Amino acid sequence: MNCQRKCSFYGTALHMVYASPQGLQMFGERWDRIVAERGAQAALYLADGRAITFRELDAEARALKPGGDHVLAQGDVPQILRLLLAGFLHGVPVQMVEKDRARRIPACPPPAGTALIKQAVGGSGVRRCQFFTFDQIAADVDRLHAALDLGDRGVGVAAISCAHSFGLTMTVLQTLFNGVPTCHAPQPFAQPLMDAMKHHPRVFLPGVPALWKSWLMGDVRFDNISLAISAGSPLTLGLERMALEKHGLKIHNLYGASECGAVSWDETPGPREDGRDLGILLPGVQARRDDAGRLVVASSSVGLGYDEPLPGERYGAGVFTTCDQIEPHGERLCFEQSVGAGINVAGRKLSPAEIAEKIRRASRLDGVRIHGARSRDPERCQDIVAELDLPQAEIDPAFKIRACSLLAPWEVPRKWIGRP
């Protein structure tokens, strides 16, 4: 069977299994302790000002009985939080899916002990599923909790997608594993964000550089922010200095990957001197360069592997080779470039193959090639470029409208190149 050949990478039995009894017991004991100690306290603050307590969240999740071999965690923050907890409590793998995406059915059954499934493009540019055990999830959550002192930072504001690894680990998983309350900001724009934050004396705010730029240039007040974190794409020195000069706010740069969780962060209280500075390794994370200069990460939060590994990849058994070329500078990491095919648009990783296929279907044009190019807006990171086997004169507004009819707004090319 082709699926068996692809999945032999894991070295596990190829049949559906629930989360391991040991992992399930570990999570269950942690969660029961949180409910016993903080049952009447708020676990989730909703956009309308109401709050759901830990005891109420526990009851709602236990009432959700998974009907199949997985739980699909999709929707807004309250839905994701309930569904995650329901799957974890019942020992059923939870698959994270963004609101505007369809579920990718894994190409093979999840390996033994799988508790969480992410579907992501990542640096490779290929959308795949990634599998994680309870222990691997907890390792990433606890590593950030300790290094960033999240237990003493107040409420975590979920203004970015909780279906993404960064938003997931910094907010709702902190709630489920460490009892840190989450505040739901229904939209990442200035007014909804301020409405969400204003009820709390102290909050920590994760965001991507494009959002931080929007917040800093808008009317957002940051008086109650105890910690500002940026990830997803490089944080420029200009944006970091704007935050300090305009608001006295230090934005800490965090680096990681969905496959292995957080790797390093800028722990300094002042501005960096080099925009490539990715900070120091987080405790328990080891890193080195391979012969191609790519960063190889070894830690307890590295996942089990992909559903469809590509030739030459190394992912699993505690080790992950990234698509990023990194230069060590003493105890700090310095970003050089990404050598993967993935396109990074404002912190969102996109697949060139997926975009090209949608344009082919919509335009009925076979010759479509998609790649990323550096954007003039550094916070955007990259722009999408479409190269078409079509005379340039025929790439008019009507053609673009038709060609983009199947694309999400963030997948639309900014540059179109045809034949002379």
Predicted regions span which residues?
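AMP-binding/adenylate-forming catalytic core of the ANL superfamily
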Residues: S299, G318, C323-I417
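Gly/Ser/Thr-rich phosphate-binding loop
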Residues: F204-P206, L216-E273, Q286-R288
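Conserved ATP/PPi-binding loop(s) of AMP-dependent carboxylate-activating enzymes
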Residues: I280-L281, R288-V319, S338, L350
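ATP-dependent adenylate-forming carboxylate-activation enzymes
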Residues: G75-D76, V92-I105, V180-H200, P209-A210, ...
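Conserved AMP-binding/adenylation subdomain of ANL enzymes
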Residues: V141-V155, A163-F204
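Conserved AMP-binding A3 loop
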Residues: A115-D142
